[in-house]
């Protein structure tokens, strides 16, 4: 029978999936042919029924016989199909089901992707305005404005897109000569220590100790400059030359006094650190501590300020407090917005 032979062909195990598709298509076509034959038989039976109605009862027996024959033929075909299906192995059924499942999955995936592509809107680049075209006629894209810093302590924002300079350094300019004093140069002092690391690390301290007599020279020079300024200010006849000399002396006095003040501050910081280290060594030697405690820079500065304030006289304290008050007020004014500056 043709159906049984085709089903037996489908039962054979094949490696490639194209054979399964071919067999499935053939079986579908066979099923459609069977359906068409059944429809034709039903149509014929209907037609015969109509003829019997028209002709009378003489054709009724013939139509009944034809119906019985068609029913018996269809029952035989169904029994053949069921018997052939019972002979199919489970491996062939599993392979056929797997091939059909893969094809169905792939079709659903492609359909989903196509629907998503249809739904997703196409992003078109923003068209530049007329103002931007007038401002940047030759540029393809206008430069983006960088956002401002959150605070003055934040790092500066710089774009990574910047034009490379067209200039090229062919000959490097000579280095600017710097005046160096070998008495206070750290390189010279490190070489003169003969490889002693304890002395080499504290080269500046040893230099200050060796040339401590220069401080007395500076104080004498400062006193002479102040006397010279006082005599020029007391003179009645003042010309342009004297005024220029007075301004020069004032600048020199302020620079020398500031330099001496920094020397004193650094010396006081060294004394504070030396005293703290001495105390820590004694505490470790006595067994009160197992490890030393190192002061931070902020703690050292705070200790220096307290010492200087205790050593000042009454007038010096008032002057220092007034300077501090002005400094804090100017700092607050800088941080204040412009609208409040005008009101206050």
Curated annotation (Swiss-Prot):
Domain of life, per UniProt, equals Eukaryota
Family classification: Belongs to the RRP36 family.
UniProt keyword annotations, A-Z: Coiled coil, Nucleus, Ribonucleoprotein, Ribosome biogenesis, rRNA processing
Annotated disulfide bonds? none
Q: What Pfam families does this protein's entry cite?
A: RRP36
InterPro entries linked to this entry: RRP36
- Species: Paracoccidioides lutzii (strain ATCC MYA-826 / Pb01)
Subunit text: Associates with 90S and pre-40S pre-ribosomal particles.
- Assigned GO CC terms: 90S preribosome; nucleolus
Function comment: Component of the 90S pre-ribosome involved in the maturation of rRNAs. Required for early cleavages of the pre-RNAs in the 40S ribosomal subunit maturation pathway.
Show the segment(s) annotated as Disordered: 15-83, 95-167, 311-344
Q: What is this protein called?
A: rRNA biogenesis protein RRP36
- Compositionally biased residues, Basic and acidic residues: 311-321, 329-344
Q: Which stretches does UniProt call biased (Acidic residues)?
A: 33-54, 61-70
As for subcellular location, the record says: Nucleus, Nucleolus
């Amino acid at each position: 029978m043709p159906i049984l032979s085709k089903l037996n062909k489908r039962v054979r195990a094949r490696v490639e999936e194209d054979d399964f598709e071919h067999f499935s298509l053939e079986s579908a076509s066979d099923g459609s042919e069977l359906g068409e034959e059944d429809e034709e038989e039903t149509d014929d039976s209907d037609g015969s029924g109509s003829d019997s109605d028209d002709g009378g009862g003489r054709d009724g027996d013939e139509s009944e016989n034809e119906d019985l024959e068609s029913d018996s033929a269809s029952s035989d075909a169904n029994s053949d199909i069921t018997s052939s299906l019972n002979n199919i192995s489970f491996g062939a059924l599993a392979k056929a089901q797997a091939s059909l499942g893969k094809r169905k999955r792939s079709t659903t995936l492609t359909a989903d992707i196509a629907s998503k592509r249809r739904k997703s809107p196409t992003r078109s680049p923003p068209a530049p305005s007329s103002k931007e075209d007038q401002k940047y006629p030759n540029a393809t894209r206008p430069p983006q404005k960088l956002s401002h810093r959150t605070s003055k302590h934040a790092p500066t924002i710089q774009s990574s897109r910047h034009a490379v300079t067209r200039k090229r350094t062919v000959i490097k300019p000579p280095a600017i000569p710097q005046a160096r004093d070998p008495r206070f140069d750290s390189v010279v002092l490190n070489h003169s220590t003969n490889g002693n690391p304890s002395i080499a690390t504290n080269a500046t301290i040893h230099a200050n100790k060796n040339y401590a007599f220069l401080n007395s020279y500076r104080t004498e020079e400062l006193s002479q400059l102040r006397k010279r300024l006082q005599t020029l200010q007391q003179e009645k006849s003042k010309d342009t030359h004297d005024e220029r000399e007075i301004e020069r002396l004032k600048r020199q006095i302020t620079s020398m006094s500031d330099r001496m003040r920094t020397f004193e501050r650094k010396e006081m910081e060294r004394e504070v650190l030396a005293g703290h280290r001495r105390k820590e060594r004694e505490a470790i030697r006595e067994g009160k501590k197992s490890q030393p405690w190192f002061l931070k820079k902020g703690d050292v500065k705070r200790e220096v300020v307290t010492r200087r304030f205790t050593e000042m006289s009454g007038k010096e304290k008032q002057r220092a407090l007034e300077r501090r008050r002005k400094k804090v007020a100017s700092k607050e004014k800088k941080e204040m917005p412009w609208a409040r500056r005008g009101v206050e």
